[in-house]
Design a protein with these regions (language model features):
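Short, conserved secondary-structure transition motifs
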Residues: 193-206, 226-231
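Portal/gating segments that form or line small-molecule/metal binding sites
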Residues: 87-96, 100-152
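Electropositive, gly/pro-rich neighborhoods at or near active sites that engage anionic ligands
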Residues: 31-88, 375-387, 391
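Local cysteine-cluster metal-coordination motifs and their immediate loop/turn environment
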Residues: 1-7, 27-38, 162-168, 262-275
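A short alpha->loop->secondary-structure connector
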Residues: 174-192
Length: 392
């Protein structure tokens, strides 16, 4: 999307040169390298522009923020359908109304392969709630902006995404090019979701085919954090529906353990649980949904923990609260966040390795401490694994 000559396209998850383009010479252009967070997320420079300063060492993992609150959707249907309380979809839908936005980029599903993630553009606030579910699958998310930035002259919108998406977005916005100018002017509101590492589509396919015994062509819908099934509590289960209307379920902990085998070096070496470069950041209110899934229920009420980073983020939150869209209460950061610990441990491991890795958000920062083995972090008692039919 950042290429001024439009020489790059996506072949599924892989960027490739367009074979239908006569002029494949880049000359001195390095726009794609400048905006790619796989080389450097550019966090230090973006924070200077956004906040007037870069993060301190004690802000290494959460970044710069003004307020930390618990937040959840007050609409029962939105709250029930959501993976973690509906804070993201409720705030996004309200932002579209409050800021008079024309579109919102969210993560949806492919029409031809409903088990595959794909970017989706919502054109009105009511559409947002169709996508109020977690998605644990890689997809070229920002490709969803291609048409709105290149073809719609005046529209403004919002983006929900993961840390790497916003690092790339901020890189695009820093470009001295037409697409950079459009991205600066027309992306008006941003919400990021914390990420310990994303998963290849083969991870979802392994759950459907190997664990549930389904044929992919029979799958019509996939939910990663489904809490609408009878007898299922937060944090939900992995579920799939098939053409005959049957719903098939797996405990969430089994999904997480399967996903471990379907990662990329880029995700595993990523230095950021949160980019810190958005108006709002959100993660689960329960710091360890894996253990909650093993136990069958959470000790926490279903909600999201929200970091407010900008005045605009604060304004949208207060407006949504005053309008009765979300519930808000002050909170502290619960200890023992599994996603953050997995991210930190893998970063320690890869910083000591020989392969190239993305730069950390603080230049030259080296993560202290020891790496905790992921098998230890995702361990499950043998009797529970046997009861749930997990293969050794």
């Amino acid at each position: 999307m950042a290429c001024p000559k439009d020489l790059i396209e996506m072949d599924d998850l892989v960027p490739v040169a367009r074979v239908d383009t006569a002029d494949l010479t880049c000359g001195e252009c390095t726009d794609c390298l400048q905006m790619c967070p796989g080389l450097s997320p550019g966090t230090h420079a973006v924070e200077e522009r956004m906040f007037g300063r870069a993060r301190r060492d004690d802000e290494r993992w959460l970044g710069i923020y003004d307020e930390l609150v618990a937040c959840w959707a007050l609409d029962d249907a939105v709250h029930s359908r959501s993976g973690a309380g509906g804070a993201v979809s409720a705030l996004l839908a309200h932002a579209m109304h409050h800021l008079q936005l024309d579109w919102a980029l969210v993560c949806g599903r492919r029409g031809d392969k409903p088990w595959r993630a794909a970017p989706a553009i919502c054109r009105n606030p009511t559409e947002v709630h169709q996508y109020s579910q977690s998605t644990y699958q890689l997809t070229p998310h920002l490709i969803g902006l291609y048409d709105v930035l290149r073809q719609e002259e005046e529209s403004r919108g919002a983006i929900v995404g993961l840390p790497c998406h916003f690092q790339a977005l901020r890189g695009i916005q820093a470009l001295a090019s037409p697409v950079g100018d459009r991205a600066r002017k027309r992306v008006a509101f941003t919400i990021e979701i914390a990420c310990s590492s994303n998963t290849l589509p083969s991870g979802t396919e392994a759950l459907l085919v190997d664990e549930l015994g389904l044929e992919l062509q029979h799958v019509t819908r996939v939910f990663y954090r489904d809490a609408t099934c009878e007898g299922v509590a937060y944090p939900g289960v992995f579920s799939a529906e098939t053409v005959d209307g049957t719903r098939h379920e797996l405990p969430l902990w089994r999904a997480f353990r399967t996903f471990k085998r379907h990662k990329t070096h880029r995700c595993l070496s990523c230095p950021d649980w949160l980019s810190g470069l958005t108006d709002v950041s959100v993660f689960d209110g329960d710091p360890n949904i894996f253990v909650a899934s093993v136990n069958g229920t959470s000790d926490y009420a279903k909600h999201g923990t929200v970091l407010i980073r900008t005045p605009l983020g604060a304004a949208v939150l207060r407006s949504a609260q005053n309008a009765g869209v979300v519930g808000v209460r002050q909170t502290d950061l619960p200890p023992g966040n599994l996603g953050l610990e997995r991210k930190r441990s893998r970063r320690v491991l890869h910083e000591r390795g020989a392969r190239p890795i993305p730069e950390p958000p603080i230049p030259g920062y080296v993560e202290p401490g020891e790496c905790v083995d992921d098998d230890e972090l995702l361990s499950v008692p043998a009797d529970i694994r046997k009861h749930e039919g997990e293969a050794d």
